[in-house]
Amino acid sequence: MMIRLIIHGCNGKMGKVVAKLAKENPEFEVVAGVDKNTFPLDFPVYSDLKEVKEEADVVIDFSYHEAIPNLVKEAAKRKIPVVIATTGLSEEELKTVEEASKEIPIFRSANMSLGINVLISLVKEAAKVLEGFDIEIVEKHHNMKKDAPSGTALMIADAINQVLPEKREYVYGRYTKTEQRKPNEIGIHAVRGGTIVGEHDVIFAGPNEVITISHSAQSREVFGYGALKAAKFLIGQKPGLYTMEDLVKKG
């Protein structure tokens, strides 16, 4: 069965990547796009999901966080599953997503790369063993990225905190710090420059040794492939919130 897609944010960098990959894959067909820039592509483009006339099986979103509430509300009305790859959502926006997930299956991940999710599994195991080590996360992205720290860096920090006996406090940069580092911290640092697609280093620093676990995305296509895998995963799922961990478990 061919999976019919609507790409929300189709004229953005990642939207175009997903459209290209879907066109090359016989399992998918892009039936429509949604974007504030309605420049026509190989499929009709609308300014709002409400305007879309085409029937679809899944919406893949690579847009901006302010657009998410309207997207999930309309998708819930239409009973269309949604893959959300947009980062930087506020608490209020996340609540709207959770509410919509009672009506439709929603897949949300701050990073659609399978590799970064392997990194998360590795750092969770490392955090269990290296319990007393200092932990620092350094993320690097291109100079057009607006949110800092990245959603992925926060996702990594949250995953580490899940397995520690006591949760650690997040410290964002140390620019105004004039005191010694506290042992109950996870330092999170953002670098922005050039065309860096995405790099994440997780540093475990202990007495006389340092372990660094790293992931580097070489192309935006890794996120596009992950989004298509997520779309396929959502077909037939019950309403609820799903993550890359669910996809990896399913294999």
Curated annotation (Swiss-Prot):
One GO BP: diaminopimelate biosynthetic process
Pfam family name, one: DapB_C
One Gene Ontology term, aspect cellular component: cytosol
Binding site for NAD(+): G9, C10, N11, G12, K13, M14, A85, T86, T87, S109, A110, N111, M112
Database matches in Gene3D superfamilies: Dihydrodipicolinate Reductase, domain 2 (3.30.360.10), NAD(P)-binding Rossmann-like Domain (3.40.50.720)
Active site positions: H141, K145
Sites where the protein binds (S)-2,3,4,5-tetrahydrodipicolinate: H142, G151, T152
MF terms (GO), sorted A to Z: 4-hydroxy-tetrahydrodipicolinate reductase; NAD binding; NADP binding; oxidoreductase activity, acting on CH or CH2 groups, NAD or NADP as acceptor
EC identifiers of the protein: 1.17.1.8
Pathway: Amino-acid biosynthesis; L-lysine biosynthesis via DAP pathway; (S)-tetrahydrodipicolinate from L-aspartate: step 4/4
UniProt catalytic activity: (S)-2,3,4,5-tetrahydrodipicolinate + NAD(+) + H2O = (2S,4S)-4-hydroxy-2,3,4,5-tetrahydrodipicolinate + NADH + H(+); (S)-2,3,4,5-tetrahydrodipicolinate + NADP(+) + H2O = (2S,4S)-4-hydroxy-2,3,4,5-tetrahydrodipicolinate + NADPH + H(+)
Domain of life: Bacteria
Subcellular localization(s) per the UniProt record: Cytoplasm
Keywords linked to the UniProt accession: Amino-acid biosynthesis, Cytoplasm, Diaminopimelate biosynthesis, Lysine biosynthesis, NAD, NADP, Oxidoreductase
Entry-linked InterPro entries: DapB_C, DapB_N, DapB_N_CS, DHDPR_bac, NAD(P)-bd_dom_sf
Top-tier EC class: oxidoreductase
Similarity comment text for this entry: Belongs to the DapB family.
Function: Catalyzes the conversion of 4-hydroxy-tetrahydrodipicolinate (HTPA) to tetrahydrodipicolinate.
HAMAP family xref list: DapB
Protein name: 4-hydroxy-tetrahydrodipicolinate reductase
UniProt organism field: Caldanaerobacter subterraneus subsp. tengcongensis (strain DSM 15242 / JCM 11007 / NBRC 100824 / MB4)
